[in-house]
Each structure stands twice: as C-alpha cells, then as structure tokens.
Amino acid sequence: MSWCIEDHPDGGLQITHLAAPRFTARWTTGAFPIDQVREGAFFWTDEGHGLDDTIHFYAFEWTDPPDNVDIKRLMDRSAYAIEVYVMG
C-alpha cells in the first residue's frame, strides 16, 4: 500500500504517499480553501469527473522532492486513492 489517508492534526484530512516521491498533503473537496494556502506554495486541484467532487491538495510537505516525476500522473493517482477511500 503506498497511500495513507488520515485525520490531519489541525483538522480536516491528509494524504501521504509512502513511496518515492514521498509527500504528505492536506486535501478537501468542494470550494478551494484559499485561506489555507500560503502565497507561492504548490497546490493542485483535480476537477473530478461526472458526479465526483473537485479535490484540492494543499500544504504539501515533500520528503523526496519530485525530480523528473510526472506530477499530473502522481496527482491523478492521489485523487484516485481519495476516491477509493471515500467510497469505502
């Protein structure tokens, strides 16, 4: 298993990618949490498909900064992991 989804200590939820490039990011659905994003910080929005909600990733903490990694593919996989989590 390369994903861990759990509560964030400050509230809300976080996702952790346990394989390189390793990272932890907070995430939410619905409206973009602009008040939670630092100016100049990396964030990602997955628009969803059909009835799926938009997923926003923010407050990234990189253990292994992504070097030569397809960020879109990594974020698509992150969104899929969250969809699986939500569907239970």
What are these regions (language model features)?
Residues 19-20, 25, 31, 41, ...:
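A sequence-composition feature that detects small, non-aromatic residues
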